[in-house]
């Protein structure tokens, strides 16, 4: 029997969620809206901090720095708190801006580490030192990147910055580890035939996953040699992949698209065995020589189709992992947090364990 309460329509007086993002280890997340921003613990979901601006409070982009008092803010919404081309590093202990950086065009994404501030513009990625007067360390040109696609890993041994290349379908992978940053080591991965839509780097920094605007294939390369490790099929129809995320131990990959289906793939073996309880699905003709790529594709070992209502059509979900068996989805239009758990019975299934609405 289904004992879950139905999800209500978003009430008109609730602040519209303009963006949502997890911190580096996904133990916290932040949401921003027309009047400020909030920070929550991921699991259990608990409000940790709420900042409401009395006037012109719209925040369109937010990025956390681990569990510190610093968050990166960019204005957005109907009445932006800051210009869309200006980055504010907000110090919530002092409740005021700590650093302000201005650029020549709108900021599309911001990524933080303890030593770096990365700003993504339409055709450029800029890397600054995270200090009181940030020094520009490097800048890289990209193909048109209107979605602000970029990913930064913060592993102590292997730190990488990934973003679209200068040619369609390519990924630029920059080694930003403190030991290598001055050498400006850049690798090019020819990942797809169409534009890069979504990126994710594993927690170990050893793997990078990517989806193109076609949205049918997810490819995973290793960061050391840029060689292809996995080719995963999401589906046959075109789709916009909104979020990709590796599990904390790198053993699984979660993928969410605008088809409202959450897929999970097993990455523990490059050639999953059919007898494995957690094996990905393979096409029956996959072993036949010279078969087209479709028949040799690896499919998710478990998936969940998420019911939607009219007010949540084209909603954009953001993925995070609470642990190696639990996935959290942040929904912007619905303004809710959802938790899904991998459960093994006769076969693996995804179970929707709970949901909560973001506070007003």
From Swiss-Prot:
InterPro entries: PROPPIN (IPR048720), WD40/YVTN_repeat-like_dom_sf (IPR015943), WD40_repeat_dom_sf (IPR036322), WD40_rpt (IPR001680). It comes from the Eukaryota. Its main location: membrane. GO terms for cellular component: cytoplasmic vesicle membrane; vacuolar membrane. WD repeats lie at residues 12-50, 191-231, 236-275. Involved in mitochondrial or peroxisomal functions and amino acid signaling pathways. This is SVP1-like protein 2. It comes from Pichia angusta (Yeast).
């Amino acid at each position: 029997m289904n004992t879950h309460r139905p999800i209500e329509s978003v009430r008109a007086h609730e602040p519209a969620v303009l963006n949502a993002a997890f911190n580096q280890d996904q133990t916290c997340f932040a949401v921003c809206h027309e009047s400020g921003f909030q920070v929550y613990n991921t699991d259990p979901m608990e409000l940790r901090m709420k900042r409401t601006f009395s006037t012109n409070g719209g925040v369109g982009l937010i990025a956390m720095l681990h569990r510190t008092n610093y968050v990166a803010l960019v204005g957005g919404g109907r009445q932006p708190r800051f210009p869309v081309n200006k980055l504010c590093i907000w110090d919530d202990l002092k409740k005021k801006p700590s650093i302000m950086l201005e650029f020549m065009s709108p900021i599309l994404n911001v990524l933080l580490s303890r030593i770096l501030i990365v700003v993504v513009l339409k055709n450029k990625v800029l890397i600054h030192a995270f200090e009181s007067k940030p020094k520009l360390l490097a800048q890289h040109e990209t193909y048109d990147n209107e979605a602000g696609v970029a990913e930064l890993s913060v592993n102590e041994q292997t730190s990488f910055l990934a973003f679209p290349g200068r040619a369609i379908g390519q990924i630029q992978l920059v080694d930003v580890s403190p030991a290598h940053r001055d050498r400006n080591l850049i690798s090019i991965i020819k990942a797809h035939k169409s534009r890069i839509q979504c990126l994710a780097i594993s927690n170990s920094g050893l793997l990078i996953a990517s989806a193109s605007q076609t949205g049918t294939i997810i490819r995973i390369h290793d960061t050391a040699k840029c060689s292809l490790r996995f080719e995963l099929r999401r589906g046959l129809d075109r789709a916009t992949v909104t979020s990709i995320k590796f599990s904390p131990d790198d053993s699984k990959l979660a993928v969410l698209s605008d088809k409202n289906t959450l897929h999970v793939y097993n990455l523990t073996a490059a050639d999953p065995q059919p007898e494995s309880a957690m094996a990905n699905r393979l096409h029956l003709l996959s072993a036949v020589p010279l078969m087209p790529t479709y028949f040799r594709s690896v499919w998710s070992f478990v998936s969940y189709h998420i019911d939607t209502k009219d007010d949540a059509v084209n909603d954009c979900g953001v993925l995070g992992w609470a642990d190696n068996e639990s996935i959290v989805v942040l929904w912007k239009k619905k303004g809710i947090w959802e938790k899904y758990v991998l459960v093994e019975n006769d076969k693996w299934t995804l179970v929707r364990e709970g949901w909560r609405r973001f506070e007003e």
